[in-house]
């Protein structure tokens, strides 16, 4: 589901990467912060920014953390080139539209917020008194924090994620067994979707910490990748297995991702998004199409899995199919038919053994 993660999050992650510890940009901002002079930095010298600029002087010099620190001693804003490689202008007065709403109080932060909204550029405000770096982009406001604080929060989030993944594994193990026995209820499916989304929301938060930590986030990144190897893929395939026929599973995924915490914990709300009306979740038996389970068989391309599901419609019928029935499907020869039969048999055996442990 990562490619469908909300655009706002992706936009913020890209911004944080440019200002992560170890980058020249972060070094320059930290220098201004330590000097307690305050500052306003606009990332990008496009036409919209230049229209709002008044006064100041041209620099057109290569970006340097020490240059930006010296230029911040003046009252005006600093404008950098779009690729962040040049300091274009300094000591600029920014004159955004005063009718643009902002909830900021200080003059520097009000200006930064309005310029970001009006131009769509990233604007960074460094507070003189509060010792805080604030990033603005469109409606996004994000406060950069010290690496030690971020690292502590990231470690705490990893611990939470470990617990969530352990619960998800149990829920998935139960769903696997029910799928092989064709005894799945809507309640079991919704529980798996909810647990997957809970894990992915923590992953999104940790991704943000990793971007903000830069080089210091490598260990956290490795731990994250180890914990959530196939969670996203499985989550999407559950939705593809169970959403109503005429529905676009990608849009169902996006709808679930955009739900508030209260909404996605409401089982009936998830059920409705999946295309089921007001039906009792525990009493409604549903059969999977088989995308998720067949995708676990090694060396079977996804195009073949799609042909398989298209032909048999349900996992139950794929399990019951003979070698000859499988052989008739486009892209499946005798060798693949054997691989599918033995692969599903092994998966069923593993599922039963895990349940007994």
Swiss-Prot record:
Residues 9-147 form the DAC domain. Its cofactor is Mg(2+). ATP binds at residues 76, 94, 107-111. It is an enzyme of class 2 (transferase). Gene3D superfamilies: 5' to 3' exonuclease, C-terminal subdomain, DNA integrity scanning linker region, DNA integrity scanning protein, DisA, N-terminal domain. Keywords: ATP-binding, DNA damage, DNA repair, DNA-binding, Magnesium, Nucleotide-binding, Nucleotidyltransferase, Transferase. Its EC number is 2.7.7.85. One of its GO terms (biological process) is DNA repair. Belongs to the DisA family. Homooctamer. PANTHER family: DIADENYLATE CYCLASE, DNA INTEGRITY SCANNING PROTEIN DISA. Participates in a DNA-damage check-point that is active prior to asymmetric division when DNA is damaged. DisA forms globular foci that rapidly scan along the chromosomes during sporulation, searching for lesions. When a lesion is present, DisA pauses at the lesion site. This triggers a cellular response that culminates in a temporary block in sporulation initiation. Also has diadenylate cyclase activity, catalyzing the condensation of 2 ATP molecules into cyclic di-AMP (c-di-AMP). c-di-AMP acts as a signaling molecule that couples DNA integrity with progression of sporulation. The rise in c-di-AMP level generated by DisA while scanning the chromosome, operates as a positive signal that advances sporulation; upon encountering a lesion, the DisA focus arrests at the damaged site and halts c-di-AMP synthesis. This is DNA integrity scanning protein DisA. It comes from Clostridium acetobutylicum (strain ATCC 824 / DSM 792 / JCM 1419 / IAM 19013 / LMG 5710 / NBRC 13948 / NRRL B-527 / VKM B-1787 / 2291 / W).
């Amino acid at each position: 589901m990562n490619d469908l993660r909300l655009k706002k999050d992706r936009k913020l992650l890209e911004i944080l990467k440019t200002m992560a510890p170890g980058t020249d940009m972060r070094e320059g901002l930290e220098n201004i912060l330590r000097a307690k002079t305050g500052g306003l930095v606009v990332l990008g010298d496009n036409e919209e920014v230049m229209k709002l600029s008044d006064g100041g002087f041209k620099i057109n010099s290569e970006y340097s953390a020490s240059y930006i620190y010296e230029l911040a001693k003046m009252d005006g804003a600093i404008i950098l080139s779009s690729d962040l490689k040049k300091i274009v202008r300094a000591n600029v007065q920014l004159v955004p539209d005063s009718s643009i709403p902002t909830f900021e109080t200080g003059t520097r932060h009000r200006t930064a917020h309005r310029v970001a909204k009006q131009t769509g550029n990233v604007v960074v405000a460094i507070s003189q008194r509060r010792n805080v770096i604030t990033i603005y982009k469109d409606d996004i406001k994000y406060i950069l924090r010290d690496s030690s604080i971020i690292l502590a929060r990231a470690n705490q989030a990893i611990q939470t994620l470990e617990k969530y993944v352990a619960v998800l594994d149990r829920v998935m193990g139960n769903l696997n067994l029910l799928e092989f026995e064709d005894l799945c209820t809507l309640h079991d499916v919704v529980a798996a979707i909810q647990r997957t989304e809970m894990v992915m929301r923590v992953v999104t938060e940790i991704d943000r910490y990793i971007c903000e930590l830069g080089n210091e986030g490598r260990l956290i990144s490795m731990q994250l990748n180890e914990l959530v190897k196939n969670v996203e893929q499985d989550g999407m395939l559950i939705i593809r297995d169970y959403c109503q026929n005429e529905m676009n599973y990608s849009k169902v995924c996006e709808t679930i991702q955009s739900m508030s915490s209260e909404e996605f914990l409401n089982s009936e709300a998830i059920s409705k998004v999946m295309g089921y009306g007001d039906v009792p979740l525990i009493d409604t038996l549903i059969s999977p199409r088989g995308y998720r389970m067949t995708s676990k068989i090694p060396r079977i391309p996804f195009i073949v899995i799609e042909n398989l599901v298209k032909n048999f419609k349900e996992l139950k019928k794929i399990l019951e199919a003979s070698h000859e029935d499988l052989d008739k499907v486009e892209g499946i020869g005798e060798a693949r038919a054997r691989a599918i039969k033995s692969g599903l048999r092994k998966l069923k055996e593993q599922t039963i053994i895990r349940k007994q442990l």
